[in-house]
Amino acid sequence: MNQYYFLSSFLSPQQPESPPLYLFQEINDLLSLNFTEQDWKSYVVLLRFFDLENFAFFWSGKPVPFSFGTVTNNNVETLLRLQMWSDEWEFEDFFKDFLLRYKTSQERLANFSELVRSFLDHYQSYPSEFLRTYFRFKQDLRIILAGFRARVMQKDVSFVLRDEDSSNPVVLHVLMQKDSPNYELPDEFFELKDVLGDYGRLPHMLNQTLSLYEFHKVEEMSRDKYFNADAILSRVTTYLMAIRNSYVSVQKGKELINLMEKGIKW
C-alpha cells in the first residue's frame, strides 16, 4: 500500500498533446523499485501490447518505427524464431498457433487482425482489472472502426465482422446498423460520432483524434481507483501514449491506423 501511495503522489498527471513528463527508462526504474512481481508482470503485458504492432511492421518489410523494448528491430527475428518473449516467458498459445497457421510474412500480415484480437481476448482473464478494462475497450474500438470503414467502403459489415465474437454486444450493435441510413454508436462510444463524421476519411487526422479520445478514456478507467496498481497502470498508460506520440510521425501515424486501429480482416 505504501508504494502505491508514493507512486500515486509522485507521478504527475500527463496532459494530452503535451510532451512526455517522464522518459521511458525513468518509468521503468521507478516501477521496478516499487511494483510487486505480479504488478510488474501486468506492466510487461501492457508493453507487449504497445509493441505488438511492431510485428506487423516487420512482416510488411518496414523498420520498426518505435519500441518500448519488447519488440525491436534487433530482436524481432529472434523472438519469432524462438517463440519466446524473453528467457522466462514463451509466446502465448494463441501466438504459437498463429505462427503455425500462417507461415509467410504475407499471410501473417494479412491476418494480423486475428493476432490482435486473440491477444486482447486472451488477457480478458488476467488478474489486473485495468488491463481487462483497457483491452476490452481496445477490442470494442476495433469493431466500431471496422463497422464505420465497412460503411465508408460500401462493404458488407457482416462479412467484415465474420470472425468476431457474435455474443459481444458491440458486435451485435454494429451488425444491426447494416441497413440503417445512419451509423449509430453504442452509448459507451457516443463521443466518437462527431469524430468519425469529421475525420473518418482522413487517416492521419483520425489517428490523432483517436489517440486523444483514447487518452481521456484511459483517464476515466482510473477515476475511482486510488493507491493501487490499477491506478498506477492507468497513469503509466498515458505516459506511454505520450512517449509514443512524441516519436511517431504523421506518416507513421497513417501506418499505425492501417496496421493497428483497423485491425479487422477484410
From Swiss-Prot:
Q: InterPro entries, alphabetically?
A: DUF2764
Q: Which domain of life is it from?
A: Bacteria
The record's comment on protein family reads: Belongs to the chlamydial CPn_0087/CT3_09/TC_0583 family.
State the protein's name. Answer: Uncharacterized protein TC_0583
Give the species: Chlamydia muridarum (strain MoPn / Nigg)
